[in-house]
Each structure stands twice: as C-alpha cells, then as structure tokens.
Amino acid sequence: MNVQGFQKLTLLDFPGRVGCTVFTGGCNLRCPFCHNAGLVRNPVEGANQEQEVLKFLAGRRGLLDGVCITGGEPLLQPDLEQFIRRVKELGYLVKLDTNGSLPERLEALLKTGLVDYVAMDVKSSPAGYALASGSEIAVSRFERSIRLLPSAGIPYEFRTTAVKGIHTVEDFSEIGRWLAGDSPYFIQTFVASDNLLGSGCEAFSRDETEALLNAVKPYLPAARLRGQA
C-alpha cells in the first residue's frame, strides 16, 4: 500500500483508543480547505513506508490499541485490504477515514469484518458538494456510503469541517435533514495552514460555529462540536 507517512502516537484520531495514524497518498477530491495538499496532489513515488509502519507496529504491541488509516483517500489503494489484514494479524484495531466517494469499495471492505470504526467526511449539503469537494462526483455516490454505515454493525461517525466561504447555516440545516437520525455527527473547526489546496479559507468564530450546530441539532440530536477552544 502507498503509505506516505505515519504519526507514531495519536490520542485523538481513534476515539477512545491510543493509536497511530497512517497516511495514504492520492485523493479523488480537491477540497480547497484540505490540509494534506502534498498527499493529494503530489504523493512521492518510491517513498512507500508500509514496511516501516508494520515493523513499528510489531514493536508496539501492548502499547498501542489501534491504527487510523487516513489520506488522501485510503479506498483508492488497491491493496488496502491486504494491509489491514497484516495490521489485524498484529493484534490492532483499525479505523478507516474516508470521503465516501467509493461506496462499492467501502461496502466490500465492511463485509470482510476487518474494520472496527469508520469516520466519513460529509463535505457539505448535497447542493454544496461540488464547491466543497472540488469535484463533480455524483452526490448519489456519497449518499450510498452514508446509508451503508448505520447498518454496518460497527462504531462510525460523520463529520464536516466548517469553512467560512464554503459553508452557510443553510448548508448545515440541509446536512441535518440529509443525515437525520441518531448517527454520531461532528462539526470540526477549520485550522488554517500553509499546506492547503485552496486559498481564502477561514474559520467560523465560536458563536458562528454554535449557530451551525444549532442548525443541525433538530435533525441530529447527537451532533457535537470538535476542535473548539
């Protein structure tokens, strides 16, 4: 698998677990607020760290609980399942981060029983998806993934990074209607950096973010904020 880097310790990426995070190269979206621009546009050929990661994990058994696989978009990797099997053989739980654009691959992976937790990014409301994702992938593909997770039998979450200029309060009302139910949902704070895909992205203020949450809550009672100071 094309592993472009890994973080040896995270207390945040895998809820309730002490883990490490593996970053895969390449993505089929071009979200202007993406903070992993290098992984999306220019993954380094020949820089695969898969064996280094597996060796690291072999030496951390009993110290780490799980591995978060993120990107880029991990489901683009043709040998993702094989990598996960090797991680599971070492005794680790596996969390998958995905943008949900590849529902067939997501469904096939879920059926293997290898994944213990899935976090899916919901980029925006259906009407705002093209702007937020920088792509023309049919919204129906993301919706298929959204419908898969509640019946997968494993913990999961939906999450949206809130970005001023990309999202509005109405977008979040529509997201709430789209996801309506008891699914775990997080509105994440946008953090500016020098490694963004686009420009002009700004964070909402705390009060503005609370307004976004209030727009979602009637439809998603479990909605929460993540990353607010």
Enumerate the predicted regions with their spans.
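Conserved alpha-helical substructure of the radical SAM core
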Residues: A37-V67
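Short, charged low-complexity linear segments at domain edges
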Residues: M1-V18
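A secondary-structure boundary/capping signal
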Residues: F23, T70-G72
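Conserved beta-strand segments of alpha/beta enzyme cores
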Residues: N2, P184, P221-R224
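A C-terminal junction/extension of Radical SAM enzymes
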Residues: E210-A229
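Conserved AdoMet/S-adenosylmethionine-binding subsite of the radical SAM
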Residues: L54-G66, L75-D207
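Conserved beta-strand termini and adjacent loop/short-helix elements that scaffold enzyme active sites
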Residues: F6, Q188-F190, L225-Q228
